[in-house]
């Protein structure tokens, strides 16, 4: 039965030329399959490689078979022997020595033995190097060293396979689009086709070492094309950290980027890693036999375990160290600083490192606000007749203001390290004291806010706890501007306002003050006789006087004509009543009214904020935010914003009690809540972002970045200032100097969709800038445009189409990051709502120029006469001069100061008038008037569905409101934020691969690329930088290609004028270089889009960008038939010939010429161009003068040229090439000698006068010398292939000579 099956199988099996019988498939390669074969003559097993002839031309096939016949002469224990070749109609069969154990790549598979230990890798690599030494001595470059081409026997002998022929097969394949070799093991010069040499095999050896140690070669986690990109781009492939120093050094030698610096195979055999491991291996073999492998693996795993433990301990120690450092940096002395002290942060950072005890001082500032409330009350409200704390001239006395002096001293002391340490000790001593010292500090800070108070007013309310003096409470406040107290009545209900002065007449007020003074004097007398006096007594005292007068508190109106002496005690009582009304059980109107009155009171008496926060805190107010009533929520948010405004301590307090996530819940899109609430929430978050790094960190920790992303609304015209807030907030986040990498912030923002929003914002800002610029360049200047608006108020009327909801709290200065800190939390949010503002001729300097101009126009258009036109023009002239204002403390130093800024700084105080002098109900009245305008339209009417500005000035599609806004919109502000957005995109483009992958969506890239021809050069440069950064990541290249990046980039090379033209060309060429490198499809696409003329211009003009243009131009010869045709039509061959004089580019240029000729079409236009006398002379002269270090590399391109064109071959031979070839036969390099002999043979076969060639050059004698030298051959290592070629050529010459 068995005999019958065997016989049957024999008859069914294929046989080759009746000599070999094909068996099972044992391998599969790029150019065919490998079968086991049986030699029918002697019974030897062989390996038979079967290659399809489908894409191989007959001429190339003959060359390949000749190469195999030549390689049959090689014989070495560490190479697979070629036994011959057989050709059928469809296939070429290459007969090879059979190596039974297969390849190392198969052995290290996870399901077999897995990765090898270093000791075993040394055994195999040493044999690989010995095989390479032999091949290189014979003039053969392997070109494809890898685990799959290293075969092993059962005795552990290693043999190199698949050398020499793979190269010929690749070159012969007319449909190939790749370079020779397997991507992950290829050397950079092989990928770039800049000259393959023996050193290319050394690079592949290094990759094979990593493959045997880890089971995969370098970059195996990437696709082949990105891997090729990284091989060329990176300085060196990544080397595993766990390797020994010797093997690491071995790999660094293999991975030298410059092939000339790599050692040869013979040198590497003497490397310490190979030498030491060989000795250890011999000892191991003698003592332990085959068990050595298992023990080595165990010891290796133990070492790995110990290493992991050490690493874990190290990481743990680092974390502990970082936690200490972070705690000190976050909670240390820095938290006691005032705003002035930010400049000395570095010095305080040094003092933190000097003392770890500073950690205990963290708790002082925050806790001191809450504790010891009675002390704070007494410091604010108690009475004392001797005024210990403050003398009449405003000078502090030693005992009363010792703490203030110490605080000021600490501020000054922070400028030096030594004094900073003393300050740290003082702070540490105070950290456990929750008494009046910390409270006084917060109080003094609050009192300093109104800068209009006189010098002695600064310390008026900063008495120490023991001082119960109230003289300053009733001292005439003549230095307070008249408008300061007016706004308290702005929020009074209309019913109360109508009552006028009825509750308390002027005389009654004076009587009240007299009674109160008398009662105070009586209490002072009692105090001198030993009775105690505190804030509670003061309150009861005031209530008693008020009860005597039976005053209607609810109907109380603070008349602006009233004497300030009489208002203060009444406000104190009103304050207590209003605070008590902030309960969820109260009615909606009562809560809203109380909040509005408290806001007005806090504006006039900021020190009351300290009382409120200390006595009540934020928790009662937070309870009100749970109310479902939107009016209550909005009013409470306004109150919170007024309290925390410009006070870092209060902001930190609000953060610590959990206000951030609560307020964030109101910052979402308007479909979830009213726009007013969202604006108030935005103002709160803006304060946190711009005040201090601590509040910013808390904001980020509460997932604040997604909230900022949400503020980047698509409708820029409608949400202008909210968009500005988001942009500035993101920059604040990026500039935060903490241990968290900026890349993490980029990833969070990108994950939440910021990139598409940024690009839409970039588009909208660019359109706004263009519209603003057009408005400026119109026939009317800003003065005339404004006055025409004032004269014709109808211009503000809008066409029908919907309106805005009324607002009682708008901010024109909200989110203005480049201005002074907003003075009010209830100014207009953006320019589209400025029309709702009440009339103010005196405009605050912290508003944008746009807002100032517009408000004057709106005032006139809404019935408020401008009685003094001369007031308008000076303001406008100042606005013309006013530069973008600087950042406040804690903000980014982003805006570049324009020339002449300091010269105009004196203008700002002229505009810095009080903006809150008008009653708040003017805002309400104004809002109603705007709503009464028929068909009032939103500015968003000019926006497309994507939120992009589409209108132009004067167009019928734009609303009147937006047209007016755009007319007066400051182009500087829009262009400034346009630049910021472009810089933000650049930050994301510089991030890691994950962030870049978010940026590489098709729609996003397409939108970005379509902006190339719409933006000004500075913004265009930034966008091009983004594209260039993306192109450096191999994972982004496919996405860029799909988005037609090449098509959009190339037109930018046509820019010829401007200061930035060189930088623009640099970014474009660099991006194109990254995109087109290695990839022939992209090279062809670039050629189709007209890149070749630009490249030739850069090359011929000797531009600095030649370094990018030259490789691209040379790659075009390899790209496609179309690209080669374009090259020829634009004179590319002449450029290549001129590059032969360039030592660095000559080899690449010659190879490009050879490729163009090899792929020449039937018209033979390339051949005709090369047959010109100048071209022939250039080629011959180049061969003669080529530097020695490049000589080996130019022989293969010359061989391609003369074998592809017999006419060029003959012309070169008769014009001086033949003597040069024969003269260089004494070259000692075997690779050079072998190629020279091939060149001489090709020239001889096509020479018109072969006998003359033989006689004139004494060719037989030169060949005989080579053969005899080879026979002696000790010092040249026996170059077998050279000998074989010389012998074959000599026989051919002998035949010709005989004939």
From Swiss-Prot:
GO cellular component: cytoplasm; microtubule organizing center; nucleolus; plasma membrane
Location in the cell: Cytoplasm, Cytoskeleton, Microtubule organizing center; Nucleus, Nucleolus; Cell membrane
InterPro entries, sorted: ARM-like (IPR011989), ARM-type_fold (IPR016024), Armadillo-Ser/Thr_Kinase (IPR052441), Kinase-like_dom_sf (IPR011009), Prot_kinase_dom (IPR000719), Protein_kinase_ATP_BS (IPR017441), Ser-Thr/Tyr_kinase_cat_dom (IPR001245), Ser/Thr_kinase_AS (IPR008271)
PTM statement from Swiss-Prot or TrEMBL: Autophosphorylated.
Polar residues: compositionally biased ranges: 415-432, 488-501
HEAT repeats, residue ranges: 25-62, 86-125, 218-256, 532-570, 611-649, 653-694, 698-736, 743-780, 781-820, 868-900, 901-939, 955-994, 998-1036, 1043-1081, 1085-1122, 1125-1164, 1186-1210, 1211-1249, 1279-1299
Induction (record text): Expression is cell cycle-regulated, with higher expression in G2-M phases.
Region entry Disordered, spans: 291-458, 483-509, 795-852
Organism domain of life: Eukaryota
Residue ranges occupied by any Protein kinase domain in the UniProt entry: 20-274
Pfam family, one: Pkinase
Keyword terms of this UniProt record: ATP-binding, Cell cycle, Cell division, Cell membrane, Cytoplasm, Cytoskeleton, Kinase, Membrane, Nucleotide-binding, Nucleus, Phosphoprotein, Repeat, Serine/threonine-protein kinase, Transferase
Tissue note: Expressed in both the sporophytic and the gametophytic tissues, especially in dividing cells.
Protein name: MAP3K epsilon protein kinase 1
């Amino acid at each position: 039965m068995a005999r019958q099956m065997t016989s049957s199988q024999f008859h069914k099996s294929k046989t080759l030329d009746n000599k070999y019988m094909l068996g099972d498939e044992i391998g599969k390669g790029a150019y065919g399959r490998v079968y086991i074969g049986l030699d029918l003559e002697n019974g030897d097993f062989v390996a038979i490689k079967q290659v399809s002839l489908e894409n191989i031309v007959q001429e190339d096939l003959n060359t390949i078979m000749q190469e195999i016949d030549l390689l049959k002469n090689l014989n070495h224990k560490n190479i697979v022997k070629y036994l011959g070749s057989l050709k059928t109609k469809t296939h070429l069969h290459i007969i090879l020595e059979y190596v039974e154990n297969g390849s190392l790549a198969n052995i290290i598979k996870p399901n077999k033995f897995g990765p090898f230990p270093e000791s075993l890798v040394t055994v195999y690599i040493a044999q690989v190097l010995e095989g390479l030494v032999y091949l290189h001595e014979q003039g053969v470059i392997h070109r494809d060293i890898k685990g799959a081409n290293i075969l092993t026997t059962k005795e552990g002998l290693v043999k190199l396979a698949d050398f020499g022929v793979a190269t010929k097969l690749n070159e012969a394949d007319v449909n190939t689009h790749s370079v020779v070799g397997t991507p992950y093991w290829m050397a950079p010069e092989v990928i770039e086709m800049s000259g393959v040499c023996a050193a290319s095999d050394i690079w592949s050896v290094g990759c094979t070492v990593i493959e045997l140690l880890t089971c995969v070669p370098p970059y195996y986690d990437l696709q082949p094309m990105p891997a090729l990109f990284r091989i060329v781009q990176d300085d060196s492939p990544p080397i595993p950290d766990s390797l020994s120093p010797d093997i690491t050094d071995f790999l660094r030698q293999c991975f030298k980027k410059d092939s000339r610096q790599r050692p040869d195979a013979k040198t590497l055999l003497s490397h310490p890693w190979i030498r030491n491991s060989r000795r250890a291996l011999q000892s191991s073999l003698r003592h332990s036999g085959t068990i050595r492998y298992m023990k080595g693996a165990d010891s290796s795993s133990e070492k790995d375990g110990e290493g992991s433990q050490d690493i874990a301990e190290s990481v743990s120690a680092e974390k502990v160290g970082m936690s200490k450092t972070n705690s000190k940096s976050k909670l240390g002395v820095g938290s006691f600083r005032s705003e002035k002290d930010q400049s000395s942060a570095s010095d305080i950072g040094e003092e933190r490192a000097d003392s770890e005890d500073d950690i205990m001082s963290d708790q002082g500032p925050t806790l001191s606000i809450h504790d010891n409330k009675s002390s704070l009350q007494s410091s604010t409200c108690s009475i004392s007749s001797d005024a210990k704390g403050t003398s009449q001239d405003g000078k502090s006395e030693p005992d009363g203001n010792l703490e203030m002096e110490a605080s000021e001293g600490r501020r000054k002391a922070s400028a030096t390290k030594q004094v900073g340490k003393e300050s740290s000790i003082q702070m540490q001593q105070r950290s456990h004291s929750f008494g009046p010292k910390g409270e006084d500090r917060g109080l003094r800070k609050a009192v300093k806010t109104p800068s209009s108070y006189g010098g002695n007013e600064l310390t008026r309310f900063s008495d120490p706890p023991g001082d119960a003096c109230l003289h300053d409470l009733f001292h005439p406040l003549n230095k307070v501007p008249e408008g300061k107290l007016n706004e308290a009545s702005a929020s009074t209900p209309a019913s109360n306002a109508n009552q006028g002065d009825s509750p308390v007449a002027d005389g009654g007020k004076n009587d009240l003050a007299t009674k109160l003074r008398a009662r105070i004097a009586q209490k002072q007398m009692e105090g001198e006789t030993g009775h105690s006096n505190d804030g509670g007594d003061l309150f009861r005292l005031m209530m008693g006087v008020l009860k005597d007068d039976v005053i209607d508190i609810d109907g109380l109106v603070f008349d602006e004509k009233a004497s300030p002496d009489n208002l203060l005690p009444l406000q104190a009582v009103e304050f207590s009543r209003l605070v008590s009304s902030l309960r969820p059980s109260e009615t909606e109107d009562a809560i809203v009214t109380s909040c509005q009155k408290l806001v007005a009171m806090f504006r006039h008496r900021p020190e009351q904020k300290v009382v409120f926060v200390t006595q009540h805190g934020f928790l009662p107010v937070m309870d009100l935010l749970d109310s479902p009533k939107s009016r209550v929520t909005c009013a409470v948010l306004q109150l919170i914003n007024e309290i925390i405004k410009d006070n870092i301590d209060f902001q930190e307090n609000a953060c610590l009690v959990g206000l951030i996530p609560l307020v964030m819940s109101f910052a979402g899109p308007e479909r979830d809540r009213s726009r007013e609430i969202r604006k108030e929430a935005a103002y709160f978050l803006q304060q946190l972002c711009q005040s201090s790094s601590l509040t910013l960190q808390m904001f980020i920790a509460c997932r604040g970045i997604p909230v900022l992303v949400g503020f980047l609304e698509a409708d820029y015209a409608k949400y202008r200032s909210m968009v500005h807030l988001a942009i500035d907030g993101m920059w604040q986040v990026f500039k935060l100097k903490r241990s968290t990498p900026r890349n993490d912030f980029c990833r969070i923002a990108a994950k939440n969709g910021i990139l598409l929003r940024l690009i839409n914002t970039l588009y909208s800002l660019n359109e706004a800038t263009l519209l603003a610029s057009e408005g400026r360049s119109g026939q009317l200047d800003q003065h005339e445009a404004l006055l025409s608006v004032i004269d014709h108020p109808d211009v503000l009327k809008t066409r029908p189409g919907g309106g805005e909801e009324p607002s009682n709290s708008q901010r024109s200065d909200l989110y203005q990051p480049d201005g002074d800190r907003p003075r009010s939390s209830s100014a207009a949010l953006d320019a589209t709502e400025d029309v709702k503002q009440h009339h103010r001729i005196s405009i605050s300097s912290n508003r944008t120029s746009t807002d100032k101009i517009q408000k004057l126009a709106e005032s006139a258009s809404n019935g408020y006469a401008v009685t003094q036109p001369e007031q308008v023009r000076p303001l406008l002239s100042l606005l013309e001069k006013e530069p973008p204002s600087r950042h406040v403390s804690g903000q980014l130093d982003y805006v570049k100061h324009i020339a002449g800024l300091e010269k105009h700084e004196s203008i700002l105080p002229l505009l810095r008038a009080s903006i809150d002098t008008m009653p708040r109900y003017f805002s309400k009245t104004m809002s109603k008037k705007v709503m009464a305008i028929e068909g009032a339209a939103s500015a968003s009417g000019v926006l497309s569905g994507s939120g992009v500005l589409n209108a132009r000035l004067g167009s019928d599609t734009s609303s009147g409101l937006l047209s007016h806004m755009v007319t007066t919109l400051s182009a500087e502000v829009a262009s400034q934020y346009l630049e910021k957005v472009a810089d933000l995109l650049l930050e994301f483009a510089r991030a890691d691969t994950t962030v870049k992958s978010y940026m590489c969506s098709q729609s996003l890239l397409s939108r970005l690329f379509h902006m190339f021809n719409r933006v000004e050069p500075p913004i265009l440069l930034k966008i091009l930088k983004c594209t260039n950064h993306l192109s450096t990541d191999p994972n982004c290249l496919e996405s860029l290609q799909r988005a037609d990046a090449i098509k959009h980039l190339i037109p930018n090379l046509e820019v010829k004028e401007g200061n930035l033209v060189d930088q623009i060309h640099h970014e474009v060429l660099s991006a194109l270089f990254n995109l087109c490198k290695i990839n022939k499809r992209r090279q062809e696409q670039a050629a189709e889009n007209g890149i070749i003329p630009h490249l030739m211009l850069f090359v011929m003009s000797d531009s600095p960008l030649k370094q990018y243009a030259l490789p691209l131009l040379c790659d075009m010869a390899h790209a496609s038939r179309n690209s080669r045709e374009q090259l020829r039509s634009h004179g590319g061959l002449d450029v290549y010939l001129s590059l032969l004089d360039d030592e660095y580019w000559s080899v690449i240029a010659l190879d490009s010429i050879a490729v163009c000729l090899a792929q020449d079409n039937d018209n033979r236009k390339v051949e005709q161009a090369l047959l010109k006398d100048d071209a022939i002379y250039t080629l011959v002269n180049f061969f003669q003068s080529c530097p020695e270090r490049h000589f080996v590399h130019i022989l293969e391109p010359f061989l391609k040229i003369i074998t592809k064109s017999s006419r060029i071959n003959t012309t070169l031979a008769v014009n001086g090439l033949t003597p040069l070839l024969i003269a260089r036969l004494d070259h000692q390099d075997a690779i050079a000698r072998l190629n020279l002999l091939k060149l001489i043979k090709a020239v001889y076969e096509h020479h018109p006068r072969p006998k003359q060639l033989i006689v004139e050059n004494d060719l037989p004698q030169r060949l005989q010398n080579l053969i005899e030298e080879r026979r002696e051959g000790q010092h040249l290592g026996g170059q077998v292939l050279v000998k074989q070629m010389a012998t074959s050529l000599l026989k051919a010459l002998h035949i010709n000579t005989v004939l």
